[in-house]
UniProtKB/Swiss-Prot annotation:
GO molecular function term, any single one: 1,4-alpha-glucan branching enzyme activity
Gene3D superfamilies noted in UniProt: Glycosidases, Golgi alpha-mannosidase II, Immunoglobulins
Alphabetical list of InterPro entries matching this protein: A-amylase/branching_C (IPR006048), Branching_enzy (IPR037439), GlgB (IPR006407), GlgB_N_E_set_prok (IPR044143), Glyco_hydro_13_cat_dom (IPR006047), Glyco_hydro_13_N (IPR004193), Glyco_hydro_b (IPR013780), Glycoside_hydrolase_SF (IPR017853)
Name this protein carries in UniProt: 1,4-alpha-glucan branching enzyme GlgB
CC annotations in GO: cytoplasm; cytosol
Keywords of the record: Carbohydrate metabolism, Glycogen biosynthesis, Glycogen metabolism, Glycosyltransferase, Transferase
Length: 630
């Protein structure tokens, strides 16, 4: 137990300044070599503790046998060096502060005991990656003018093994199926609901205790690296959900860590999160900022993640979020100035160190400039979920078509703010739980109409400006609400109706990726032009999508009633042939097969303020795309 430390004075300086982004190399447990011998170094931050000792299966969990030594530099860090390579050993920290005694998991552990156990495990993160080709080109994959279509996945319930007690697939088993399915379906990215270690499976990963450890339910850190590696080898980007907004109050976790409110706010009005029964990080504390910044950088560095989707940003920004009693900021306002500053520093640091990735905010209010650079006063995120579009669109589609004409403005409103942020259009897990029903369950009408409505929704979504996100199961019209305890209902693909939806999503992804007009200008008003949004009586809208050059043009016409429209005239800017490249009513998608025989020649009849027009057949409950071919 010789005098040795991985932690330099400069590390302590950065830690206390709130700017350390690689604490995972310093704190926690690390196997090292000194003079040809192996040792395991442990370090934990517990500034208010009177006594800290290391307990584990190597000392029979004896609280007195391995005391740690507190550094004398005021950092509050305790350290100990043990002989031998302790990889695979379970351990915790015994912390004493006056009469308060507790066994804590390591906040920086790379691996944890399988729940319900909660000990930390000494682990090395060595892994030989095979994704160098992908990493070289990923700047293109993740860029704003590239197609980004995200498949949102919960690892524990995408697929299960019913023959073996309905067990989960492991990370490695998932790696044999998921990358190929996602590639076949044409999605560009997978977004995992949080994989960071969480004690309660029913939290879907959103109540994290291990900010540096993938959950051991599905395998080891190397197994999770293998899954990401395989996705990358198939050209699929990986976005990880990350939760810096709150953490659970489990006794072994971060809460009341050293007998004081160390990681969380001191004042209960800022500390307590009533929605989730959890604690809020103290963003004003530099060491907590260093902890969170290090966690974010860790997943991008060690796990090659392509992006972080930051959960519940609104709850961080507002001091009165879901609270009756709250503390105003120094100016008397409700904005959490410390959280705002942290989010800006987080985005600046991530983009400085990993310029090829994206940060994505789930932010449910109209907070301005979430996805604008910090130097113009924004929060600095790369993209933001468009919750307004999601709410309005699902509200509209849930209405019986006979009443849709009275809600026409709900549908058209989204374009008024569509370019105020870099938006992702999310049909996420949140829309198919808690009694909300599945996507197809929200659709009105009989069996055929439900499928036609869902096909029309997808056709409209893929044509609307913004990147795409769809939660697993939606792509084949799962009828049941999502249940994290069971697999998706893959057997539904025996039915042509569900196969049709799946084929449509695959083809929409293919068209979206192929056509620059549908993805290059997702964030630019120059790429969108209304043709007609006034036909509320028939519930028909039409618009153009264009590429950056303005030369490639696609006309999108949506008919949101089950009434076919014949000889429906739509104005277009150019003469010549317009080829039908997508029709959600096609027979292959279990539609009625109505359409425009592959395309239409423009008539020299002025319409909708344009010199030319097309006389179209609009199938019932459908969306059609026509590309100008000259």
């Amino acid at each position: 137990m010789k005098k040795f430390s991985l932690i330099s004075d400069y590390d302590v300086y950065l830690f206390k300044e709130g700017t350390h982004t690689r604490l995972y190399d310093k704190l926690g447990s690390h196997v090292i070599e000194l003079n040809g011998k192996r040792y395991t170094f442990f370090a934990v931050w517990a500034p208010h503790a009177d006594y800290v000792s290391l307990i584990g299966d190597f000392n029979e969990w004896d609280k007195g046998s391995t005391p740690m030594v507190k550094r004398e530099d005021g950092s509050g860090i305790w350290e100990v060096l043990l002989e031998g390579d302790l990889t695979g050993s379970k351990y915790k920290y015994f912390i004493k502060n006056g009469n308060y005694e507790v066994d804590k998991s390591d906040p920086f552990a790379f691996f944890c005991e399988q729940p319900p156990g909660n000990a930390s495990v000494v682990w090395k993160l060595n892994y030989r990656w095979n994704d160098s080709e992908y990493m070289k080109k990923r700047k293109r994959v993740n860029s704003h003018d590239s197609p980004i279509s995200i498949y949102e996945v919960h690892v524990g319930s995408w697929r299960r093994v019913p023959e073996e007690g309905n067990r989960f697939l492991s990370y490695r088993e998932l790696a044999e199926y998921l990358p190929y399915y996602v590639k076949e379906m044409g999605f560009t990215h997978v977004e995992f609901l949080p994989v960071m270690e969480h004690p309660f499976y029913g939290s879907w990963g959103y109540q994290i205790t291990g900010y540096f450890a993938p959950t051991s339910r599905y395998g080891t850190p190397q197994d999770f690296m293998y899954l990401i590696d395989k996705l990358h080898q198939e050209g699929i980007g990986v976005i990880l959900d990350w939760v810096p907004s709150h953490f659970p109050t489990d006794a072994h976790g971060l809460a009341y860590f050293d007998g004081t409110h160390l990681y969380e706010y001191e004042d209960w009005r800022k500390r307590w999160h009533p929605d989730w029964n959890s604690f809020v990080f103290d963003y004003g504390k530099p060491e907590v900022r260093s902890f969170l910044l290090s966690s974010a950088h860790f997943w991008l560095d060690k796990y090659h993640a392509d992006g972080l989707r930051v959960d519940a940003v609104a709850s961080m920004l507002y001091l009165d979020y879901s609270r009756k009693e709250w503390v105003p900021n120094i100016y008397g306002g409700k904005e959490n100035l410390e959280a705002i500053e942290f989010l800006r520093k987080f985005n600046e640091s991530v983009y400085r160190n990993f310029p090829d990735v994206q940060t994505i905010a789930e932010e449910s209010t109209a907070w301005p400039m979430v996805s604008r650079p910090t130097y113009v006063g924004g929060l600095g995120f790369g993209m933001k979920w468009n919750m307004g579009w999601m709410n309005d669109t699902l509200f509209y589609f849930s209405k019986d078509p006979i009443y849709r004409k009275y809600h026409h403005e709900v549908l058209t409103f989204s374009i008024w703010y569509a370019f105020s942020e870099n938006f992702v259009l999310p049909l996420s897990h949140d829309e198919v739980v808690h009694g909300k029903g599945s996507l197809i369950g929200k659709m009105p009408g009989d069996y055929w109409q439900k499928f036609a409505n869902l096909r029309a929704l997808f056709g409209y979504m893929w044509a609307h400006p913004g990147k795409k996100l769809l939660f697993m199961g939606g792509e084949f019209g799962q009828f049941k609400e999502w249940d994290h305890e069971t697999s998706l209902d893959w057997h539904l693909l025996e039915y042509p109706s569900h196969r049709g939806i799946q084929r449509l999503v695959k083809d929409l992804n293919e068209v979206y990726r192929r056509e620059k007009a549908l993805h290059e200008t997702d964030f630019s008003p120059e790429g969108f032009e209304w043709v007609d949004f006034h036909d509320w009586e028939k519930s028909v809208i039409s618009f153009l999508r264009k590429d950056k050059s303005g030369k490639e043009i696609i006309l999108v016409v949506c008919n949101f009633t089950p009434v076919p429209r014949y000889d429906y005239r739509v104005g277009v800017p150019k003469g010549g042939y317009w080829r039908e490249i997508m029709n959600t009513d096609a027979k292959e998608y279990w539609g009625s097969g109505m359409g425009n025989l592959g395309g239409k020649e423009a008539d020299k009849i002025p319409w909708h303020g344009r010199k030319f027009s097309l006389s179209l057949t609009l199938p019932p409950l459908s969306v059609i795309y026509l590309k100008h071919e000259g």
